[in-house]
Amino acid sequence: NLLQFRKMIKKMTGKEVVWYAFYGCYCGGGGK
């Protein structure tokens, strides 16, 4: 569930989910 994932990430990192998603996309699958 995406909503649960967002809550988990925010709880774990304390960072905004949008930033995490952008960072994950940029570093993981988007670019190098």
From Swiss-Prot:
UniProt KW keywords: Calcium, Hydrolase, Lipid degradation, Lipid metabolism, Metal-binding, Neurotoxin, Presynaptic neurotoxin, Secreted, Toxin
Pfam families with a match to the protein in the record: Phospholip_A2_1 (PF00068)
UniProt catalytic activity: a 1,2-diacyl-sn-glycero-3-phosphocholine + H2O = a 1-acyl-sn-glycero-3-phosphocholine + a fatty acid + H(+)
Tissue: Expressed by the venom gland.
Chief place of localization: secreted
Cofactor descriptive note: Binds 1 Ca(2+) ion.
EC number: 3.1.1.4
Compartment(s): Secreted
Cellular component terms per the entry's GO annotation: extracellular region
A GO biological process held by the record: lipid catabolic process
Similarity section: Belongs to the phospholipase A2 family. Group II subfamily.
Role this protein plays: Snake venom phospholipase A2 (PLA2) that inhibits neuromuscular transmission by blocking acetylcholine release from the nerve termini. PLA2 catalyzes the calcium-dependent hydrolysis of the 2-acyl groups in 3-sn-phosphoglycerides.
Protein's name in the database: Basic phospholipase A2
